[in-house]
A protein has these predicted regions:
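A general structural motif
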Residues: 7-9, 95, 123
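Active-site neighborhood of HAD-like aspartate-dependent phosphohydrolases
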Residues: 3-64
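PIN-domain endoribonuclease scaffold, especially VapC-family toxins
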Residues: 110-111, 117, 121
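Short, basic/glycine-rich phosphate-binding loops at helix/coil junctions
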Residues: 55-71, 120, 125
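Residue-level detector of short coil/turn "hinge" positions at structural boundaries
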Residues: 38-41, 98, 123
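Substrate-recognition element of Asp-dependent hydrolases with the DxDx(T/V) motif
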Residues: 75-79, 84-113, 127-129
């Protein structure tokens, strides 16, 4: 006997930062460029460590800096992880629905939408949370 297994269409929720977009490299590279201090990814062991690893006294100071870097937020020019876009495109071409779910500050939504378009992320549905 020969059996064929057909996978049904999946609805896949995908986060951006740390999954598709390399937020850590983005902010540490920009921080080194702006302030001359290199922060290794090995120094970052959990979320929210920007304050002790940088000169910023409060977390809000970090986000105020990240809000306007040469006229755009830190989220505008993040690099993607290797093969992340290709995997999403492949899943989409196979009939699966890609839903973007991302926690973002309100001021970064425009830049994030531009980033999604420029990187041709195959999604028709996007949810932002804070």
């Amino acid at each position: 006997m020969h059996y064929t297994i057909k996978l049904s269409q999946m609805r896949i929720g995908v986060d951006l930062d740390g999954v598709v977009a390399d937020f850590t490299d983005g902010w540490t590279s920009q921080y080194e460029k702006d302030f001359g201090k290199k922060i290794s990814e090995n120094d970052i062991t959990e979320w929210g460590l920007a304050k002790p690893l940088t000169h910023f006294e409060e977390e809000v100071d970090f986000w105020n800096w990240a809000k306007d870097i040469d006229g755009a937020s830190i989220f505008r020019n993040l690099k993607t992880y290797n093969n992340a876009i290709e995997v999403l495109v492949d899943l989409s071409l196979k009939g699966h629905e890609i839903v973007i779910i991302s926690s973002k500050p309100w001021w970064s939504i425009h830049d994030t939408l531009m980033w999604l378009g420029e990187n041709k992320i195959p999604s028709k549905e996007i949810h932002f949370t804070e």
